[in-house]
């Protein structure tokens, strides 16, 4: 949650997406955990090898379900509060624009792909 969103409202929504994806038995597919797992800076691009790396933090691997084995950073109080009080939405996808800090949420995979195309 901490690394995916910059403000409290977005953090609560990211927390909700994580909860919903776990509830639906979907992989989390979060880039931030994948970067941590392969020890790359987020300014670098993840390669196909990185995305397929079978490390315990790579939530992009399709067969990886649930949370990583441990935290990827120290959470702020805002992130802890967001996890304890997630937003009430049905979103299951989000795209975080690391340049602007904007986070785009949707419950539609095609719309998520459009966010990725527009802001990625």
Which residue ranges define each predicted feature?
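Bacterial extracytoplasmic/cell-wall-associated proteins, especially those involved in peptidoglycan
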Residues: 1-120
